[in-house]
């Protein structure tokens, strides 16, 4: 692994900066050319090795610059590490691994006091306990991520199944209502009130019909061939069957109407509970418009069946002349005045726009 003896503080292969990758796809190229290298958890470390630092006593500034990306636990200069002339090498240990990742990504190949820094991981400085802790943290992170992903996938499947079930129920209810309506229309138009099996009526309907009719369609043929001995009994069966059919049709209509009412109630409750703000505003606006239209209709309604709201205004008092002839003359004068007032045309109201058009303004001179 090591190129110079493999001792601690010497130059390792993973410390050497790699060349720029020229075979990288165009859509994967960044703002500046980079080398391509994959880091696993055993190659990453809290220890960072900084090479290319100018030897002008800038250790304090270097530590302050790296402290921007996380808490630093310790730092020191590596005097025995092979370096270029007039440069120094420093070792910095961060408190957590994520801070070290960020600092390496941000500070690698950055200009610092005239020099170009090269930052790399130094896992060879880790102790056995630090390595064990690093691997355990990585394992816990992987377990947590996979659990969240599995939970999300399971939740998504449950939501999809619930949605499919609701769609199936809605389709089923719509088909049932359509079938039952068609059956009711057919039975109302025909003389025979028997309903088709496509209405999906409960089995008790047909069983009760067969039991109560006492074998009507099948047993009536031999009875009718017995020279009219059971004529009164057969007529009684017919009347009983007719009344039974009417009762069944009424009960079916009620049963068909009930699901629709329940569904309407459920939908109204859902709307009241989950109505958005925009929908509420639109509903209020619609109600105001309906009230305004109703008020306009009541005002312009020519019929006498007007809805009066509030107390009636007092009528105009009529002057009594204490003489029939004088009262007749006064009524004639009042009617004549009303006719004259109604026949006089109203003068047209001159709008300010008409005034402006009749008297055009003088055009301003352009200077």
From Swiss-Prot:
Key word RNA-binding present: yes
CDD domains assigned to the protein according to its UniProt record, in alphabetical order: RRM_RBM48
GO molecular function: RNA binding
Residue ranges of the region described as Disordered: 217-243, 280-302, 343-367
GO biological process: mRNA processing; RNA splicing
Keywords tagged on the record: mRNA processing, mRNA splicing, RNA-binding, Spliceosome
InterPro entries: RBD_domain_sf, RBM48, RBM48_RRM
Compositionally biased intervals (Basic and acidic residues): 347-357
Methyltransferase among keywords: no
Domain (RRM) ranges: 46-124
Gene Ontology cellular component annotations, sorted alphabetically: nucleoplasm; spliceosomal complex
Protein family: Belongs to the RBM48 family.
Binding partners and assembly: Component of the minor spliceosome. Within this complex, interacts with ARMC7 and PRPF8/PRP8.
Protein function: As a component of the minor spliceosome, involved in the splicing of U12-type introns in pre-mRNAs.
Protein name: RNA-binding protein 48
Annotated organism of origin: Homo sapiens (Human)
């Amino acid at each position: 692994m090591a190129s110079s003896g493999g001792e601690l503080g010497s130059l390792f292969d993973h410390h050497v900066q790699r060349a720029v990758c020229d075979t990288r796809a165009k859509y994967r190229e960044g703002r500046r050319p980079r080398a391509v290298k994959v880091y696993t958890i055993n190659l990453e470390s809290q220890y960072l090795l900084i090479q290319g630092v100018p030897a002008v006593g800038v250790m304090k500034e270097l530590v302050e610059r790296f402290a921007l990306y996380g808490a630093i636990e310790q730092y020191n200069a590596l005097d025995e590490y092979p370096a270029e002339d007039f440069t120094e090498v420093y070792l910095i240990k961060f408190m957590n691994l994520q801070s070290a990742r960020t600092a390496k990504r941000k500070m690698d190949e950055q200009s610092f006091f005239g020099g170009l820094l090269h930052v790399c991981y130094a896992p060879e400085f880790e102790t056995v306990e630090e390595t064990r802790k690093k691997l355990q943290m990585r394992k816990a992170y992987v377990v947590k991520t996979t659990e969240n992903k599995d939970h999300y996938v399971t939740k998504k499947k449950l939501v999809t199944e619930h949605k499919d079930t609701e769609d199936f129920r809605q389709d089923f209810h719509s088909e049932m209502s359509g079938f039952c309506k068609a059956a009711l229309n057919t039975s109302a138009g025909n003389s025979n009130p028997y309903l088709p099996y496509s209405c999906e009526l409960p089995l008790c309907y047909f069983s009760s019909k067969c039991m109560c009719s006492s074998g009507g369609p099948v047993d009536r043929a031999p009875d009718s061939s017995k020279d009219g001995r059971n004529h009164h009994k057969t007529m009684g069966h017919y009347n009983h069957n007719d009344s039974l059919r009417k009762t069944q049709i009424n009960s079916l209509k009620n049963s068909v109407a009930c699901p629709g009412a329940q569904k309407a109630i459920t939908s109204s409750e859902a709307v009241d509970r989950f109505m958005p703000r925009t929908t509420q505003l639109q509903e209020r606006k619609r109600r105001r418009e309906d009230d305004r239209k109703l008020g306009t209709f009541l005002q312009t309604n020519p019929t006498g069946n007007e809805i009066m709201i509030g107390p009636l205004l007092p009528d105009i008092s009529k002057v009594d002349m204490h003489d029939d002839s004088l009262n007749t003359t006064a009524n004639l004068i009042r009617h004549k005045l009303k006719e004259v007032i109604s026949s006089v045309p109203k003068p047209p109201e001159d709008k300010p726009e008409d005034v402006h058009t009749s008297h055009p303004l003088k055009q301003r001179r352009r200077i």
